[in-house]
Amino acid sequence: MDDERMLLLSLSQIEGLGNKAKKALLFHFGSAIRVFSCTEREVKGLLFLSEREKDALMSGLKEPVPKNIIESLKSYEISFVTVKDSEYPALLLDVYNPPFIIFYRGTLPKANEECVAMVGARRCSAYGKKASLALSSLLAKNGISVVSGLALGIDGFSHEGALSQGGRTYAFLGCGVDLCYPASHEDLFERITKNGAVMSEFPPGTKPLKNNFPVRNRLISGLSKRVVIVEAAEKSGSLITADFALEQGREVYVFPGRYDDPLSRGTNKLIYQGAGVILSPEEFVSDLLSIKDTALSFTGGTVKGKTRNLEDDEAIVYSCLDFYPKGFERLSTETGLPLLSLISAVMRLCDRGLVMETFKNEYVKV
């Protein structure tokens, strides 16, 4: 591990500094090495940090990475990726408060890997089990990866279905990746590391505390363009994932259920609020594949002709845009362009009819 990565790990573990502050420090100083060599006078002059954050930074600069974390990385073969790394899952840059660092065991998703998130009730019904196994196995059979949270019930069956077809699946944990929670999923945990990854923003040694799980839900939806709520009661934690998905501009789908079934009240309510309905796993996957084919066809014909005379910065921005929304923060990271140049290029692409704004300050290819 080189000095920069070691210091990025150290920066990630400074208590009292949020992800936003850590990224701002990297942007300001240019590298973790420079952050850790800054003087007290420089810290006091940082206008984007509060006095409390400045104190936290000064304390953190004196402390190396905790030995227990280093030992866990080695003992459990844990890797990590930071927001500064090209391997960092790009979709996660769109989530609220993107993790500064992600610890994982296994292999990260590829840049253009298609993922669908699947979540639902822990104490699911036979119907929920059947639906989650059927959909996840069919997704995997067609080369689409499954993202979930390793919980009992729908989460576990979603991972199992993907693995049954030799597919890839990813689990975001509410604890460190050196721990398997629940313990009964230890075998599933190990199989996921060989056909995907178990991932967490929490450092090794973090216990599965109750408050960690709603926080990690934003990453389950964030890693996917589409989120499926298989089965959920009226106050299910899965509805938190649905809320995050909507905030992130993701599509939300549900399996419908009987009106008098407590485990379908949450999903049926989402239908009432406008969520997509999955009439069958086959139809849902068929629609996904047709959307994928349509997106690929946009690279030819009229659009291709319109992109021939783009300015350099316009071409860079256009190549980074996709058919799902991206915001300026993510585009800035992907393109490396100064913010003003980026905004100007996006506006010109909008004027040309190549790009459109779908949400406030979020853009897609047309």
Regions found by a protein language model. Name each.
Residues 1-2, 82-366:
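Glycine-biased, small-residue-rich flexible motifs in mid-sequence functional cores and linkers
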